Amino acid sequence: ALAMNVGAYGQEILNVVEWAEVVEDGGGVRRLERWEIEGGYRWSVLGVGRVVTSAELALKADDPAALKARAQQARERRRGALPPEPSAGSVFRNPPGDFAGRLLELAGCKGMRCGGAEVSQRHANVIVNPGSATAAGVRELAAGMAVRVRERFGVRLELELKILDRNGKVVADPEAALARKPPVW
């Protein structure tokens, strides 16, 4: 959550982080203060060569009934927009000035399948696991989705999911996540 600066409805988790303790690439432990933690839409320095082990969040006190009501509203809103099947959430980041889900839907991605993974019928930017999805299936499906959008709209979608290559490095380009040409859809 901290590494990707998760957020919803105009809020991001980095807005409330006071500090985070991380294990760095070399194995050293370091505490980063708020002013050292840069981030933006779906990224933060906490996710670059680091693993977050603990953090302090500065949450605001509010009336418990009001908090419960807001939480319930958010759950209902998400329940209406996101599929009930198991998923990893949004596949792609929104491109500037548009929505990945809109482009994917217009490109005809809903219902696409590969390796047991399937693009949700409810939200085109979500790959669901109806029961037998494989990592390779998710990777190939994401690449196929990105190809469709690029070919139809000239927009290169950027992964929000973290896909690792064989060396454990994050692959940002979904088309490059494939060792071979994407399947024909």
Predicted regions and their residues:
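Phosphate/pyrophosphate- and phosphate-bearing ligand-binding catalytic cores of soluble enzymes
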Residues: 23-140, 144-185
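A gly/ser-rich beta-alpha-beta helix-loop segment of oxidoreductase catalytic cores
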Residues: 1-18, 87
